[in-house]
C-alpha cells in the first residue's frame, strides 16, 4: 500500500479496495480557509495547511468554485513549499457548467495551473444531484474521466453527492468509481446518501470520504443551545472531537474532511485523530451525542424522516425530502451558510418547491402526517422569495 507523508501520530486508512493508497483519516477541507477583508488570508492559510501536513495529513480537498478559485491557488502555493509530492490533492469539476462534450477541458486545465500540478490525484464530479448527474451524462463526463485517467492527468475518479439514496445507488453503479464524497454526521445519519450510502459504496469497493462532519459548524458547540453546551461540559465531552470520533468509530470512511480556519482547530483535530479507530467512541460520548441528536430532530422545522413515500404520488416530480432537508439545515444554522440556497438553485425546475401544484396527493402517503403542500409553500418563500 502506498502512503505519503507518514507520521507515527497520524492514523491512516485505505481508500476503498481499488486505489492501493493509505489516506490520513483527517483531511483538510479547503473551503473555509482563514479570511481577511473578504478574501483568503494567504499567509495564515498556508501556515494552517503546513501545520496539518506537518502532523501527517496527506489529503487536501478543494474545488474549482471555492472562493472563486482562490482556494485552489492557495493550496497550490502551500504545496510549493516542498509538499507537492507528499500530499494527495482532491478537487472538483463544476458539472453544472458542462453543456456539451469537451467543456471539461478548460476548467480542468485551469485547475492544473492553479494547483501547480501535472496530475490531479483525486478528481470529483462536483455536487451530483439529479440535474447535475444528467448534465454529467449528456456532456460525457464519464468518458472524459476515462480519457484523462489514460493520459495520466487524473489518478482516481470520484464524485461528491447531494441528493437521495436511490440516486446515489444509481450513480455508484453507473461507473467504476474509485471513491466518492458524502455528507455524514451524527445529527442526521440518514440524510442524503446517509449510512445506507456509506455501506453501499464501501461494499462495492468504493472509498468514501466524509464531508460536513460538524453539520456546517452547527455541531461545533457555539451554535448549540446552552443546555447542550452545558451537557458537553458536565460530561467532559468535547463537541468537536466526539463528532469526529463518531465517524471514525465506523470502518467505512477513509477520510473525514474538516473545514478548519484557525490553527488551534487544526491542532485540536490532530490531537483527536491520534486515537481514532473503529469502536473508539465511548459510551459517555455516545449518550451525549444521542441526546443532542434527539434535540436536533425535535427542533428541526419539518419533521421529515426522508422515507420518500410521498415521491411517487407527485404528478410533477417535486423532490420533497431533499427540499425539506435543505430547508431544515438552512434554518438550523440560522441562514449563515450559502450551500442550501446554492443546492436549491441547482435543482431542476420541476423538482423545486415552486413546482408544487397543491394537489395534496402526497399528504396521504406521509407517515409523519405532514402538511407537505403547506411546507412546500414555506420552502418556496425561503429560497425563491415568493410569499407562502
Language model segments and positions:
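N-terminal binding-site loop/beta-alpha segment at the start of enzyme catalytic domains
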Residues: 1-87, 150
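A general structural detector for well-ordered alpha-helical segments in enzyme core domains, enriched
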Residues: 11, 44-48, 71-78, 107-111, ...
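Structured C-terminal cap/extension of enzyme domains
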Residues: 15, 51-53, 58, 196-388
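Local beta-strand N-terminus motif with an aromatic residue
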Residues: 23, 60, 86-87, 117-120, ...
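Glycine/proline-rich, positively charged
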Residues: 36, 96-214, 226-227, 234-235, ...
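Alpha-helical structural signal in soluble globular domains
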Residues: 51, 55, 74-82, 114, ...
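Short catalytic-loop micro-motif centered on adjacent basic/acidic residues
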Residues: 59-66, 155-159, 181-182, 255-257
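Structural motif corresponding to the early beta-alpha repeats
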Residues: 66, 82-101, 126
